[in-house]
Every structure is written in structure tokens, then in C-alpha cells.
Amino acid sequence: MGTTASAAQQVPSTVPSSENVQGNGSGSSNVEDRNSLSTQSFQNVSIHNKAKSIITNKVAPVVITYNCKEEFQIHDDLLKANYSVGRISETMPEHYLVQGKYFMVHDVYSKLDVLNTTSSCGAPNFRQARGGYEVYGMGQPSLNGFKQVLQKLQSNGHKECVFFCVREEPVLFLKLEDDFVPYTPRRKENLHENLHDLEKGLRAENLELAIRKELHDFAQLSGNSYYVYNDIEHFKDEPHSIIIHCEEDIHVTEEVYNRPVFLLPAYRYHRLPLPMDGAPLETQFDAFVNILRENPSLLLLHDANHPPPALLFSCQTGVGRTNLAMILGTLVLYHRKGACEKQTISQDTNVLPKQRFQVIQNFINMVPNGEAIVDEVDKAIELCSEMHDIKAALYECKKKLEGIGEGYQIQGSSTKEYFLKGTLHSLERYFYLITFNYYLHEQYPLAFALSFSKWMCTQPWIYRLQASLNLSELTLSGELITKGTRVLVLDDRFSPDVLSTLKEMNVANFRRVPKMPVYGTAQPSLKATGSVLSYLTDAKRKYSNILWVNLREDVILEANEQIFTPREPDNLEQQIAVPAASPEQLEKLEATVANHVLTSQKWLEVYLEQEKQMKMFKTCRTMQEIFNQHRSAYPGLVYRRIPIPDFCAPREQDFDMLLQSMKSMLAEDSSAAFVFNCHGGKGRTTTAMVIAVLTLWHFNSIPEITEDEIVSVPDAKYTKGEFEVVMKIVQLLPDGHKIKKEVDMALDSISETMTPMHYHLREIIICTYRQVKTAKNSKEMRLLQLRSLQYLERYIYLILFNAYLHLEKKDTWQRPFSTWMYEVASKAGVYEVLNQLGFSEFENAEEQPLCRLRYRWQQQNTNLLPFRGEFI
């Protein structure tokens, strides 16, 4: 009997997962019992290739495993043993499953061809954008159908064609009579849904090649046939057996779409996967722009009289992704050709609301020609709306979101949540189309000198806008509380007095930076505010001018001399941040809620430190009213509300407001005191105290930097904040090392005052990152990953702010920090570094979406609370 050990060196093109190997690990050599094969023994052996090599040879060779202690006889039945089988229902035959779990389903059935163009044009829903633009869209054609489409374009007079397949899912073309017909792998749970969100690094093209090899093997094991499904509505006569003699009976997408280039030299094919929902990634925009760069006839560099190539886009049905791609193509040709031929606006467009979404209006307000940029996108959407109007779909989704009740469910999930997700995805897609048109305005005349992703890093404020799509909290009033939809929760319930200052100062966690007029505290009541002000103005401290800054983003009420905040009854710990455009907007909303609670005179459900009670409030004040009451006794008191996000770096404009408030106070009195508070007096308060310390040092004098102590503890390097990404920023900045050390000095001086809290803005970064490995579940792990990155970014922003204080000191900081960041720091590449933020010493940042600005900043305004109010 012959033996082979070399088979163990072969590398399979597709390795079956271990759970699909039907073995019990007994190690028996009984060749009749397939279940006796040890899964472990074959982990590193190419069963796929081995089995294939012996199909025509019934001699059973022996394979010696790597440790040379066990041997097994492998018959040709082994291949079958390592493929999974399944069936749609008990009445249907069992057969092999693609990739161990998928059924091959006919890609497009006749009902999807709404425009009825398959027979006349070769593809379902084939159409041209209106306005004379050379932009076409279609659903998935067969091989012969695609040839017919190309003939159609030639007959329309197009000498050049650039074709984009915008599908991310694998598509295989199986031979059927004289044509090759598209099939896609689908899950049994949802045979109507294609695969999407493929694993990181897994390309559809590679998956198609792997599936083709599998299908060929399946057919060899089943008499040169394989079962596929054509009718997944009624399953009449299903499944169908399709003949496969060789791999040439199966085409992959590239073979169908790329081969015409040999017959039509002016034809080009590109695969540009676009998402089913939401906006494309920056890398996908980059890929599209790179294709445009490669086609001179699409650029202004070319003779304007020379017609541009036809742009043809295709997905499965020719609707969602194709529609998105057609709009992108139309915008490009608008910049190439100018305004379109005069068209009548469709009836549907006229019935859409005239009022813009707030995030779109905010964009218009920030861009000089913003109105025109948005109008051009609206026009492009209208010109491509024959099959699908993304604006109409957006407003329809919004209407359903606001109109549906709480209790409804879709597939076990909240219907309201389903429509909220749909509205956010649609608005994000619309927003990114507008952003892309803004990019075209700047970069098209320059032949795309900057890629889209690099350009976005020069416009970081766009990411700030995109992070605030859902502004529904701005539409709410106190009615939610008086109706019992939300409840009032005592602030102290989730704000422990770790520093034990409540007894002496009537407020939790009150502290001072050593030798500096900078104080921090938890949220005070009217009485506690009086205690702190009395303490600061007593004979020992003698402060006559005090700036008090409240850093909270949520609604705060003092009712019956206790501090309460509105919360969801099912999630009492979650603060409800209000995405206000200004402090005044938040304070106005706060006053509305307070007035509603007071005038309702209802018994309201409130949560105290331990128990739940019903209370009727005789008083209900806002923070502004509390400080107004103290102003007569303390005429030098100035109160400011500067809401900054919890856990994160303050936004650029937050630094502006903090610095401006301090500058104004110091202009009045150079020895004024500064008090900061958030909810518990920890995260945001400490951040603001660091900003205040750095600012005062620049107004007065910066202490000498002491030499670093030699510390021999685990992670000492990272405890000192010497992460690779931090050092990249340090290297970019003039005197970067000195600037970082000054920030560290400020952080260390403040942490001395809060030792019992075990909270240090720099040291918490590595502490939180280390906790990711011990997370109890995936939800906790994702939260810890986010927090560690947010803490890292916060530390970097403090370093950048100190650099700004140094570099702009000569002009007394006339240029705001936000302007400096956008005009100076962005050109130096700071936002490009922040767009790859991660712990590169431990992991690959590119594999983590949260390392990118788009996703990380989006999380600042994301919560898992039920949708309330209107989507404005």
C-alpha cells in the first residue's frame, strides 16, 4: 500500500470549517466509518485537494500526519464527508451547500424587471438618466444579455463605455443552453437576501473563484449535476438540476464583464462595490475617483467638445445601488458638461416638503455656495429617479418613523427602531452625495489633486455635521415627563461622593488644583452653589470675580431643592444628551421643560437614590435661574453653559468657548477663580480643568518641566502616554515633546487632587484598552474599544490645544482654536493621523472602523434609547 506525507503540504483554495468535518476524534482507522475521522488530525491537511486527487484512483493511500504517530486511510468518500449538506424543506432533496451553508438562487426573476427591458435591451430595468447625460443603469444581465446591452449602447452612438458593477456579493454565471445565467449564494433563513458586509479582506472576486471550484467538485460527486433554485416564491418544481461538466461551465463576474475589452478597445470594466444601505465609505469614493482619473475624456483636461464615455452601472435589480451610482455619475458629467437639457420636474418631486433637514441646512450655512451645491444634487437625484427617488424614500421613511406606535415589531425588533435606522441610512446617503458634489466643486477643476478621503481630512467639520444626523431631542418638551414616558432621576443616584466633600461643601467631589484658582465639582443645587460661592469669597480666599462653567449636555432641573434629570425608565443610567447647536438652544429647551413640569401640577414618578416615589413639585428651576438668584449676593459671578460630550475630546468649538470665556474674565480680573462642573465632577470637569490650567500658565508663566522619574512598572511607557499615534502628533508639532510634557504636568497636578477617584486622564487610556481582553461579552468589548480610543483622542486634543496656545500667543489668540485646527493643523496632517487613530503597537488600526473619524465621532451622538419627537 502506498503512502503520502506530501499531501499535508498542499494549501486548499477553500478550507472547510472544523465544525463541518463530521468526526468524533476517536482516531479509529475503520475506513467504512466516515464519522471516525479525527477533526484535529486533518486541521492542517488539504482534504479538498487530497480527495480530489484520488477521485479516479480507488486505491486508498495512507496519509501520515505531521507527528507521524497516527495514520489514516482516505477513500474518495472523504471529500463527501467534509462538505455540508442541507435542504430547503423536508419534501426537497438534500444536496451539498456552497461554503458549507448557502444555496444557489437564480439572481433576478421576471417580476423585478419593472421597466420590462430584458428582452428589448438585454437587462432588467435598463434606462438612461434624463437630461441628456450619458449615464445608464440596469439590473443583472446574463452573458448574452450583457452583449445585447453593449450593442444597444453602440447603436445609441457611444464609442466609449465605462462599466461599473456595484455589487459587493459574489455572482456566478451557470451554463444554461446557449447562455450563462447569474446565480447568487443565499442563506436558508432569507433566500431573498444577498450576502453583504463580507468579512474584512474577503473580496467578492476571490469568493467567486472559491465557489466555482466547489460547484465543480459538487457536480463531480453528483453525476455532473448540481441543484439550484429558480422559484423562491412558490418553489414550483424546485430545485432544478443544472449540468456542470467542467469549471468552464461556470463563469465568474470578471469573465463575463472583462472579456469584451478584447473586442471593444474603448470599453472598460470596474468592480466598485457599494453598500446596500447608507453612504459609501471614503475608500469606495476614492476607488471611483481613481477610475475617473484614468479616463481623460471624463476630465476638463480633454477637449470639451469630445463626448464623454457612457457610464453604465449595474447591481442586482438596477434600483438601490445602481441609482446611487447613477447620481454620482450624473454629478461628474454635470461638472464635465455643465447644466443639463431643460427637463420638467416630476410630479412626485413637487410634493416633497420644502423645508430641508437641519443637518443639510447646517451644511448650507457653512459653505459659501452651499445652496447651489445642494440644488445640483437634488437635480441629479430627480434626473435619475425613474426607478427610485432617494429623497422621496427618505421622507417616506421619516413619515413612517414619526407616525408608528411604540409596540409594533418587525421580525422581532422594534418597528420604530427599524424605520429610524432606515431614515438615518437614507439621510447619510443624501448627505454624502452633497459632500461628494462639494468635493467635485473643489477638486474636479484640479483633476482630483486630492483623493476624497484626504480631502475629507481637510474638511473635518463635515464629519462633525455627519455625526449629528438625528436631532430629534431638540423637538421635545416636558410633556414626555408629565405623560410618564420619561421619568425624573435624582442626580445623586449615579454620582457618588468619592472625595467626601458633601458634608462640608454640600456638593460631591469638590476640589482645587494646587496653588491655582481652578476648581472642579459635581453638579450643585441652589444651596450647594451658595456654599461654594461663600467658600470662594471668604476672608481666606477673597475671590471677587468667579467664572462658573457648567459642562453638561443634558437637561438639568432643580425641583423641590433636589437636582433631577429626565431619563428613559428602562435605561436610568443613560444620560440623554441634547445635540444643541448652541448653549442658548439647550438653555431654552431646559426652561421649556421646567415650565411644563411646574405648571402641570401632576404627581410624577421620580427615582431617588434607592427607591422610586411619586412627587408633585412646588418649585422647578433651571441652572440659569439658580445662578441668577446668586448674582445679587455675588456681583462678580459669571455663569456659562458650555456643553461638551462625555468621555470624548471636546469639539474644536468647545475649546473656543472655554478659552473665550476665560479670556473675558481674565481681562476683568487677572486673579479670578474658575469653577467647572459636570454630572459627577470627574471626566468632563477634569478635562476643562486641564484646559484652564494650560490657559492660565500661558497668561502667567509656565512652570519648569521636571525630569521624568524612572518608573519600572508594567506599561510605564503607555502610562506616560507614549503611544505611537501620540508620538506622531508630537513629531508634527514645533517643540512637540515640550508641549506634551506641559500637558502631562497639568494632568499630574490635577490628578493629585482626586486620588480616591483613581482617575487620571492619561493613565486611563491604557487601563481601558487592557480591559478589552477581559470583556464579558462583545457589547462590552465594543464599548471598551470605543472608550479607549476616545480617551486617546482626548489626550491628543489637549496636546494640540497647548500647541495652539504656544503658537498663537503672539496674536493673543485672536484666531480661534477651531480655525487654527482647520487652517493650520489640518494642512500639517493632524486629521489624517486622527483618521487612523489606534493602538498600532498592539493591533492593526485599519481593521477597526472606530479608528476612523467618521465612525468614532458618530458614536458621540449615538445612543440606544427609543426614538422620541420629530426627525428634523
UniProtKB/Swiss-Prot annotation:
It comes from the Eukaryota. Keywords: Coiled coil, Cytoplasm, Lipoprotein, Myristate. Gene3D superfamilies: Protein tyrosine phosphatase superfamily. Residues 186-210 form a coiled coil. It is found in: Cytoplasm, Cytosol. Residues 1-37 are annotated as: Disordered. CDD domains: PTP_paladin_1, PTP_paladin_2. GO terms for cellular component: cytosol. Pfam families: PTPlike_phytase (PF14566). SUPFAM superfamilies: (Phosphotyrosine protein) phosphatases II. A lipid is attached at G2 (N-myristoyl glycine). Belongs to the paladin family. This is Paladin.
